[in-house]
UniProtKB/Swiss-Prot annotation:
Keywords from the UniProt entry: Cytoplasm, DNA-binding, Transcription, Transcription regulation
Location of the protein in the cell: Cytoplasm
Protein's recorded name: Probable transcriptional regulatory protein TRQ2_0469
Keyword Transcription regulation (UniProt): yes
Predominant localisation class: cytoplasm
Any single biological process term in GO: regulation of DNA-templated transcription
């Protein structure tokens, strides 16, 4: 059985390989702008900015694009005033959906989201409706083929402050408290591991979906991810691995 994390990884790989890579850049630039505006333009003293810049570098964003986005955030260059807004709701099958958006027009974003929720048989809900289902956590991912000694990896991660390690899927996931993410990441990198790190929201419980509901959920999540204003989408669905792959193949085909 797999859930939101597997879907997100598949979606990210597809976007990185095709013409939608520009959407990744658009979202990352917005994140850099807002992070620099809120915490300053120094990545050494601004953890959120450092994380955004590291993700941009991992996607091979040109250095000048990153620097320009930082300057827009600090006010050195003129830029759009993006606001961070959280939206909550339910997808088909009672699946909880938690959306983080960066927008220059909250009314437009709310209207577009309401349209998508209605189109795919979900419902946009009030603030607090589903946020209690999710926990904010740091997540470090390592490709399984990069790990020669799983026990050694576990020992390093635990000693550095990791809370949990999920090694049943690829990539391997190391879960931390958000404030410990940088420390655990640094220790793993010092040990020679290539890692990707992010702060995310993990569901405390899941809802299994199958058949038409499963297809509608994945189609809906894809549509949400394709919105320029939407930065991150989190959900608590669970479905059979094979069924997910078959549905995604049809949707992307």
């Amino acid at each position: 059985m797999s859930g939101h994390n597997k879907w997100a990884n598949i979606k990210h790989r597809k976007m990185a390989q095709d013409a939608k890579k520009s959407k990744i850049f658009t979202k990352l630039i917005r994140e850099i702008i807002v992070a620099a505006r809120e915490g300053g333009g120094n990545i050494e003293t601004n953890p959120r900015l450092r994380a955004a810049v590291e993700r941009a570098r991992a996607e091979n964003m040109p250095k000048e694009n990153i620097e320009r986005a930082i300057k827009r955030g600090t006010g050195e260059l003129e830029g759009v005033d993006y606001q961070e807004v959280i939206y909550e709701g339910y997808a088909p099958g009672g699946v909880a959906v938690y959306i983080r958006a960066l927008t220059d027009n909250k009314n437009r974003t709310a209207q577009e989201l309401r349209h998508l929720f209605n189109k795919y048989g979900g419902s946009l809900a009030e603030s607090g409706s589903v946020s209690w289902i999710f926990e904010r956590k740091g997540v470090i991912e390592i490709s399984r083929d990069k790990v020669k000694d799983l026990e050694e990896l576990m020992m390093i991660a635990i000693d550095a402050g990791a809370e949990d390690i999920k090694d049943t899927e690829d990539p391997i996931q190391i879960i931390t408290a958000p404030e410990n993410l940088s420390e655990v990441k640094s220790k793993l990198e010092e040990a020679g591991y290539e890692v990707e790190a992010k702060v995310t929201f993990i569901p405390k419980n899941t809802v299994k979906v199958t058949g038409k509901d499963a297809e509608k959920v994945l189609e809906f999540l894809n549509a949400l991810e394709d919105m320029d204003d939407v930065q991150e989408v989190y959900s608590n669905f669970e479905m059979d691995d094979k069924e997910m792959e078959e549905i995604l193949s049809r949707l992307e085909g």
